[in-house]
Curated annotation (Swiss-Prot):
Signal peptide: none annotated. Belongs to the FAM13 family. Keywords: Phosphoprotein. Residues 262-275 have a biased composition (Polar residues). InterPro entries: FAM13. The modification Phosphoserine is found at residues 131, 238, 385-386. Residues 27-45, 99-112 have a biased composition (Basic and acidic residues). The keyword Phosphoprotein applies. PANTHER family: FAM13, PROTEIN FAM13C. Residues 26-45, 83-138, 171-216, 250-282, 349-391, 441-477 are annotated as: Disordered. The keyword Phosphoprotein applies. This is Protein FAM13C.
Length: 585
């Protein structure tokens, strides 16, 4: 013990500080033991003895004033160290067990330090005017100036450990078998008393061991927990954190564990930035994708309206992309549209040929209109014109439908059917006008030839003239009569009675003659029209439909004469109107 003190007293400049620290050690030991015992008594008051009482038995009564002063100093120091009690209370039991083996030497060491305190004061040469109160004040300053972090820099841990080991060997030889369940704080204070011969850095090293031991253990445990929670590709969510909220509160402070929802002051707002964590869970249905796209469109539209209100013009593509949030909306919108298109394509592939059914039915129903209207034979131009535009599948379907439907011959030709063939009739009329080129008023011939002696070839152009003067409606009505009449002209032209007055010399007739011809022509027209109407009514009663071109062959003469009389009647009306105009002029 004497050699240890001599090692610390080689430098005379630290003599007063050494004496002050020696005076402080028993009292600080008593105070720390009292504090630790109070902490332990709060947890288990029955199983632990009063450590403060054991120290007071060994302490001499002459040091009571100094103990009171130093107790106040330690209490002030304990105020400056409010968090150390928390760390010491959390110290694991395994550390208490590991240090219990040294406790029997520590109790005897306390008694030895008290008995040798006077000897320290004499050898150090303490001045007479320094009282215990001054020593306590110096001790208080020393304690207040101790650093809390990196206290091991003053003295190496190896020297402190060797000094403590030598002291334990000397004291263990004196007393054996004494067991005192002192806490870890007693050992730290005892180390201060043992190393009191050294200057203040030795005192700092003792407190560093007491402070850093539980603090290092706590930091190691906390860092391992935080490493398990926050590190890695897949951070671990707190059990108190809702999985559905997709919260990332554990990333806000990497040095602290996630707090429960009840301790949080606010809820994290929903925004598009937080939606990025759920990109892996894209909506998988068409409805969800459509809603997502509509919401993005709504956001972009609101941005455009706000931009237009502020700058008085609509934003361009560059204005939209310059805003990071709008750029993200646009990218999400393009991605959502692409996913929606792929999803629809996938569903259509799964359904197979189901979407092709309705168009095929429509194509099959449309060509069946001529069949239902009773024109299976006369609808020859329709399949030829529509067959070029429809696919082979439609033709096959049309044939199948025609085979399934029963034949209907009593259907009527409607105006809608005539409008379908109207383009063909218009083309026929144009070609006919180009080829015929008729003249309304033929040249006047001076010879007075009879109608019988006049060649029939001269009458052919006049016969073809009325067709060009017919209106569109009449031409459509009687255009089907032209071809059969033309076909019958070479064979039956001799049997047809020529008119009494030819159309070539009608312009030479006077007004009374024209009026007589007008009355006769109207009478003939009524007669022929009546005959043709009776034929059509009888045919309709028999077949249930109006006669077509091939059905008019038995009445071809009447149809030809009726057509010629209509043309003559029109010419007479024109000539009479001309003479009336000339008379008025």
């Amino acid at each position: 013990m004497f050699s240890c003190f001599c090692f610390s007293l080689q430098d005379n400049s630290f003599s007063s500080t050494t004496v002050t620290e020696c005076d402080e050690d028993p009292v600080s030991l008593h105070e720390d033991q009292t504090d630790c015992s109070s902490l332990r008594d709060e947890n288990n008051k029955e199983n632990y003895p009063d450590a403060g009482a054991l120290v007071e038995e060994h302490a001499p009564p002459s040091w009571e004033p100094q103990q009171q002063n130093v107790e106040a100093t330690v209490l002030v120091d304990s105020v400056l160290r409010p968090s150390m009690g928390n760390f010491k209370s959390r110290k694991p039991k395994s550390i208490f067990k590991a240090e219990s083996g040294r406790s029997h030497g520590e109790s005897q060491e306390t008694e030895h330090v008290v008995s040798s305190q006077s000897e320290c004061q004499v050898r150090a040469g303490t001045p007479a005017h320094e009282s215990p109160q001054n020593n306590a004040f110096k001790c208080q300053e020393t304690v207040r100036l101790q650093p809390r972090i990196d206290q091991r820099t003053a003295i190496s841990p190896k020297d402190a450990f060797e000094t403590r080991q030598d002291l334990n060997e000397e004291e263990a030889a004196q007393v054996h078998g004494v067991k005192d369940p002192a806490p870890a704080s007693t050992q730290s204070v005892l180390a201060d008393g043992t190393d009191s011969a050294d200057p203040s850095p030795v005192h700092k090293d003792g407190q560093n061991e007491a402070d850093s031991a539980p603090e290092d253990l706590h930091s190691v445990g906390t860092s391992r927990l935080l490493y398990h929670i926050t590190d890695g590709d897949n951070p671990l969510l707190s059990p108190r954190c809702s999985i559905f909220s997709q919260s990332q509160r554990f990333n806000l402070d990497p040095e602290s564990a996630p707090s429960p929802p009840s301790t949080q002051q606010f809820m994290m707002p929903r925004s598009s930035s937080r939606c990025s964590c759920g990109d892996g869970k894209e909506p998988q249905t068409i409805t969800q994708l459509t809603k997502h796209i509509q919401s993005l469109k709504r956001k972009i539209r609101k941005f455009e309206e706000k931009f237009e209100q502020e700058k008085k013009y609509r934003p361009s593509h560059g204005d939209k992309t310059s805003n990071p949030e709008v750029l993200k909306w646009m990218n999400d919108l393009a991605k959502g549209r692409k996913q929606l298109k792929e999803l629809k394509l996938k569903l259509s592939e799964e359904q197979g040929s189901a979407p092709k059914g309705p168009p095929r039915n429509l194509l099959c129903e449309q060509p069946t209109v001529p069949r239902e209207n009773g024109k299976p034979e006369a609808a020859g131009p329709e399949p030829s014109s529509s067959g070029e535009e429809t696919p082979d599948a439609a033709l096959t379907c049309l044939k199948e439908r025609r085979e399934q439907l029963p034949p209907q011959e009593d259907s009527k030709v409607t105006k809608q059917d005539k409008n379908l063939i109207k383009p063909l009739y218009d083309r026929y009329r144009i070609i006919k006008q180009i080829l015929s080129t008729p003249s309304l008023i033929p040249t006047i011939q001076e010879e007075e030839d009879s109608d019988e002696d006049r060649p029939q070839g001269s009458q052919q152009p006049s016969l073809a003239d009325p067709a060009s003067h017919l209106p569109v409606g009449d031409h459509l009505t009687y255009s089907n009569e032209t071809e059969p009449v033309r076909a019958l002209l070479p064979d039956e032209k001799k049997e047809v009675k020529p008119p009494a007055l030819s159309m070539s010399n009608l312009h030479e007739a006077t007004m009374p003659v024209l009026l007589d011809h007008l009355r006769e022509t109207r009478a003939d027209k009524k007669r022929l029209r009546k005959a043709l109407r009776e034929f059509e009514e009888q045919f309709f009663k028999q077949t249930g439909r109006s006669p077509q071109k091939e059905d008019r062959i038995p009445m071809a003469d009447e149809y030809y004469e009726y057509k010629h009389i209509k043309a003559k009647l029109r010419l007479l009306e024109v000539l009479i109107s001309k003479q009336d105009v000339a008379k008025t002029i």
